[in-house]
Amino acid sequence: MNKFIVFEGIDGSGKTTQAKMLAEKLNAEYTCEPTTGKIGRTIREVLSGSECKKETLALLFAADRVEHVSEIEKMLQKSHVVTDRYVYSSIIYQTMQGISKEFIYSINFFAKIPDIVVILDVDTEEALKRMEFREKEIFEKIEFQKKIKQEYHKIAELKCSKFEPTYGFVMVNTTGKTPEEVFNELFNKILDKIPDII
């Protein structure tokens, strides 16, 4: 049976690189949030600095995810699916903006439960160095990223009962490691939990 794998972590932790490496290793479909669809493009405009109420942004993410989940279901019929960000990003980022978890849970009630979630950890300073040449988004300020990092630790340690992955969470620290070193570590951790994934 094909697996649904999610990558999470602060900006600059290496999610996109590692998600693509895993997709290639497993011959899986790679996807991401926000998506490249109409709603996803609107979200990217807001993240780049356009004005938007926090509740509207949360609803946009949920609406984009409705479309995304539909695509994920189709892709899972043919192969494993690896996504760069998912509902856990909404739980963390939107609650950090002052929106209640209950609101986030309610507007994401449809979200498909992943088989496993890989959380990539990294020193905040190293993450910011990695992002020096990227366009900055509204969520990329250092203090904010430190708080986000703490929230990811809470999700991994205390569990996220509403969207608990079938095989749980895996956390890998990427600080000072090459992409290959990170990949070997996370892939072995995934194999420990899901031996039949390959």
Swiss-Prot record:
Keywords: ATP-binding, Kinase, Nucleotide biosynthesis, Nucleotide-binding, Transferase. Gene3D superfamilies: P-loop containing nucleotide triphosphate hydrolases. It comes from the Archaea. This is Probable thymidylate kinase. SUPFAM superfamilies: P-loop containing nucleoside triphosphate hydrolases. InterPro entries: P-loop_NTPase (IPR027417), Thymidylate_kin-like_dom (IPR039430), Thymidylate_kinase (IPR018094). The lineage of its organism: Archaea, Methanobacteriati, Methanobacteriota, Methanomada group, Methanococci. GO terms for molecular function: ATP binding; dTMP kinase activity.
